[in-house]
Each structure stands twice: as C-alpha cells, then as structure tokens.
Amino acid sequence: MKEMMMSNMFNDVPTPWAMFFQDSATPNMEGMLELHNNVVFYLCMMLGFVTFMLYNMLTTYNKSVMPYKYLNQGQFMEMMWTTLPAVMLLMIAFPSFILLYMCDEVMAPAMTIKAMGLQWYWKYEYSDFMDEKGDTMEFESYMIPEDLLDEGQLRQLDVDAPIVCPVDTHIRFMVTAADVMHDFSVPSLGLKIDAVPGRLNQMSALMQREGVYYGQCSELCGVMHSSMPMKVEAVPTADFLAWIDEQ
C-alpha cells in the first residue's frame, strides 16, 4: 500500500484553470466521480442522437418540396421520443438515489468531530476525547494571513490549527453555525455540509489514504467569506493518538 502511495501523486488542492475534480480519498467521493462520468456518458449519447436526427432531417427532407406528403401520423416516433428520454432519466436517477442514501447514512462511526462555523473562522470539537478535567477537546481554526505564510503553505487555504484524522476510520462530521449560514466543504473527501444556526447536519467520511485535504466555506456568509478555509490532515492511527496526547 505504501509503495503504491509513493508512486502516485494525488491532486488534493485547488489548482489554477482546473477542469476536473480533485482526486478522491473516500468511497463517497469515488462514487460521485463515477456518477458524474456515467451522467456525462449518457448526455454525450443523447447529444449524438439528437445531432444525428437534426442532420438527417435537414439533409433528407430538403430534397422534396412536400416532404410530409405521405406522413399522416407518427405514433412510433412519438413513442420513441417519450420512451428513450424516460429510460435515460431512470438510468441516471437510480444510481444517484443510491449514492445520496449512502452519503447520508452514518453507520457506526468510530469517532465524531463537531464543526461550528462563525464569522469568520471554524471551531472544532473532538467529542470522544476529554482532558483530565472532563472537558472535551476543542480549538479554533483561523486562516493564516498572506504575510505570515511559510514556504510551501497555500494562500487562503492554510490554517493555524488543522483537523487531524486517522485513516481507515469511520468519522462522523456534525456541522452547525453560531451566527449565519456557512458550509463545510472538502472536495477530495466528498464532504459538503450546510452549517445552519440551531441545526445539526451530519455526514460520514472514511479516509482511505494519508494526505492533506483543503476546503473552503461554500456559502456566502459575509465580507470575509473567503477567509474561512479548512484543512484536514489524514495520518496513521499511531500519529493521530500521539497528536491527541499533545493537545
């Protein structure tokens, strides 16, 4: 597994002029990519069929002054242009329903991370870990200003306190907000959860490889909306437990 990871370079950050998705790191995101590819395939089939029919009509029926002289009714044609789109829509709908159910289903999570959006930073809480006083572990995460970035850090993406998660672990993310609507979104993990004041939304993730994943608030929340990035570090379980002990 490690040899495969070392021989591949994954795109887990936004890049200039990007034309496709970031590389997936969870089964949910892998399913979204597969659904997208299938939908694009069906759309290309429909585009090709419609283009062929238009070309055929323009070239065939222009040869006669009265092209519809012997065409009294077109029941077969009407049946086909009703049935084919319906079948294609069903082929798109059923996989999307299955994926939607899988993304919403949170099955026996090993740990829970709560994320609260505030203007304009994130606050995280590890509900399963407590200190000697019995308080849960929590911290605030702010974007690093451009003039304080170190070499290799990303502008408007790096934060002073990232989320650290163990790989190959079912993690439940519970998201809410304290003031206005925000959105917790990490593309490589297939996470996009609305943060609504007074409401808890949840979604699960199973990170299948180590890496650093970036996201940004995807709900317009005010003048500093672009200053609410999120950074997720997926590390081995031993490194995660060592990080917990340091907090």
From Swiss-Prot:
Name listed for the protein in its UniProt record: Cytochrome c oxidase subunit 2
Positions of Mg(2+) binding: 219
GO CC terms, sorted: mitochondrial inner membrane
Transmembrane region(s): 39-58, 79-103
Gene Ontology MF terms in the entry: copper ion binding; cytochrome-c oxidase activity
A Pfam family recorded for this sequence: COX2
Mitochondrial intermembrane side: 1-38, 104-247
Domain of life: Eukaryota
Residue positions binding Cu cation A2: 217, 219, 221, 225
UniProt gene name: COX2
Keywords: Copper, Electron transport, Magnesium, Membrane, Metal-binding, Mitochondrion, Mitochondrion inner membrane, Respiratory chain, Translocase, Transmembrane, Transmembrane helix, Transport
Biological source species: Brettanomyces custersianus
Membrane topology: Multi-pass membrane protein
Cellular localisation: Mitochondrion inner membrane
SUPFAM superfamilies reported in the protein's UniProt record: Cupredoxins, Cytochrome c oxidase subunit II-like, transmembrane region
GO biological process, one term: ATP synthesis coupled electron transport
Cofactor(s) the protein needs: Cu cation
Intervals, Mitochondrial matrix compartment: 59-78
Family, similarity comment: Belongs to the cytochrome c oxidase subunit 2 family.
Cofactor descriptive note: Binds a dinuclear copper A center per subunit.
Subunit structure: Component of the cytochrome c oxidase (complex IV, CIV), a multisubunit enzyme composed of a catalytic core of 3 subunits and several supernumerary subunits. The complex exists as a monomer or a dimer and forms supercomplexes (SCs) in the inner mitochondrial membrane with ubiquinol-cytochrome c oxidoreductase (cytochrome b-c1 complex, complex III, CIII).
EC number of this enzyme: 7.1.1.9
Amino acids binding Cu cation A1: 182, 217, 221, 228
